[in-house]
Swiss-Prot record:
Record Pfam families: Ribosomal_S11
GO CC field: ribonucleoprotein complex; ribosome
SUPFAM superfamilies associated with the record: Translational machinery components
Lineage: Eukaryota, Viridiplantae, Streptophyta, Embryophyta, Tracheophyta
PROSITE patterns assigned to the protein according to its UniProt record, in alphabetical order: RIBOSOMAL_S11
GO process annotations (BP): translation
Ribosomal protein listed as a keyword: yes
Keyword terms: Ribonucleoprotein, Ribosomal protein
Naturally occurring in which organism (per UniProt): Nicotiana tabacum
Protein name (record): Small ribosomal subunit protein uS11
Family: Belongs to the universal ribosomal protein uS11 family.
Entry keyword ATP-binding: no
InterPro entries: Ribosomal_uS11 (IPR001971), Ribosomal_uS11_CS (IPR018102), Ribosomal_uS11_sf (IPR036967)
Region (Disordered): 46-66
Gene3D superfamilies xrefs: Ribosomal protein S11
Length: 66
C-alpha cells in the first residue's frame, strides 16, 4: 500500500504436472490477508500447469503399499 499499489490480479498456482493440482493451505490464507489489508482484488486466476501427456506418477505399477 505504501508503494501506491491498491488493486491486484492474483494468479494462483499449485505444484501441478503429475503432482497435486490443488493449492496448499497457505494460498487461501495469503489471499485472505491481502484482502484484509485493504487491497482490491480484481481477478483470481488458476495457473496450475496441467499435463497433456504426463510421465507416470511415482509409486510404481502397484501403487503405494502401506
Amino acid at each position: 500500500k505504501e508503494l501506491g499499489i491498491n488493486a491486484l490480479h492474483i494468479k494462483l498456482r499449485a505444484t501441478g504436472g503429475n503432482k497435486t493440482k490443488t493449492p496448499g493451505p497457505g494460498a487461501q490464507s495469503a489471499l485472505r490477508a491481502l484482502a484484509r489489508s485493504g487491497m482490491k482484488i480484481g481477478r483470481i486466476e488458476d495457473v496450475t500447469p496441467i499435463p497433456t501427456d504426463s510421465t507416470p506418477r511415482k509409486g510404481g505399477r502397484r501403487g503405494r503399499r502401506l
